[in-house]
UniProtKB/Swiss-Prot annotation:
It catalyses: shikimate + ATP = 3-phosphoshikimate + ADP + H(+). One of its GO terms (cellular component) is cytosol. Pathway: Metabolic intermediate biosynthesis; chorismate biosynthesis; chorismate from D-erythrose 4-phosphate and phosphoenolpyruvate: step 5/7. GO terms for biological process: amino acid biosynthetic process; aromatic amino acid family biosynthetic process; chorismate biosynthetic process. Gene3D superfamilies: P-loop containing nucleotide triphosphate hydrolases. It is found in: Cytoplasm. Its cofactor is Mg(2+). The gene is aroK. Belongs to the shikimate kinase family. This is Shikimate kinase. Mg(2+) binds at residue 15. ATP binds at residues 11-16, 116. The keyword 4Fe-4S does not apply. Binds 1 Mg(2+) ion per subunit. The lineage of its organism: Bacteria, Pseudomonadati, Campylobacterota, Epsilonproteobacteria, Campylobacterales.
Length: 162
């Protein structure tokens, strides 16, 4: 088995699904945003504000290369922008958690949106969402309809890997 890599726009449920997959498959779960945040000593929002998005993307790119060296399979929850990195290819079996923008925004309360620097301006966030959709689809081994909730997404992933 290869790494199971969850991709999708922020708020699509990647972190929650990763935890459930880890339990179901008895695999360790890794969260790229959390790893970067712990290593840098700042939240993702603080990294964006203090070090800039370019530095965050560099940390992300380097982490992908590092994850490729792991010998055992993991469930990997990724940040929404990770698909901009060419080196994502070959990391593992990739599942795109697809959801429409309006549903994503409804799922995130104000507190959650404040943690996500790219959601400060909803008009710009929607443009980013639309721009990234093609990249998510291009990089996905499988597309998961994430509108049906966590249990439905879990069932879909488990069916694909059965």
């Amino acid at each position: 088995m290869r790494h199971l890599v969850l991709i999708g726009f922020m708020g699509s449920g990647k972190s929650s699904l990763a935890q459930e997959l880890g339990l179901a498959l008895k695999l360790e779960v890794l969260d790229t945003d959390m790893i970067i945040s712990e290593r840098v000593g700042l939240s993702v929002r603080e990294i964006f504000e203090e070090l800039g998005e370019d530095n965050f993307r560099m940390f992300e790119k380097n982490l992908i290369d590092e994850l490729k060296t792991l010998k055992t399979p993991h469930v990997i929850s990724t940040g929404g922008g990770i698909i901009m990195h060419e080196n994502l290819k070959g990391l593992g079996t990739t599942f795109y958690l697809k959801m429409d923008f309006e549903t994503l925004i409804k799922r995130l309360n104000q507190k959650e949106r404040e943690k996500r620097p790219l959601l400060n301006n909803l008009t710009q966030a929607k443009e980013l969402f639309e721009k990234r959709q093609a990249l998510y689809e291009k990089n996905a081994s499988f597309i998961i309809d994430a509108r049906g909730g966590l249990n439905n997404s879990l069932k879909q992933v488990l069916q694909f890997i059965a």
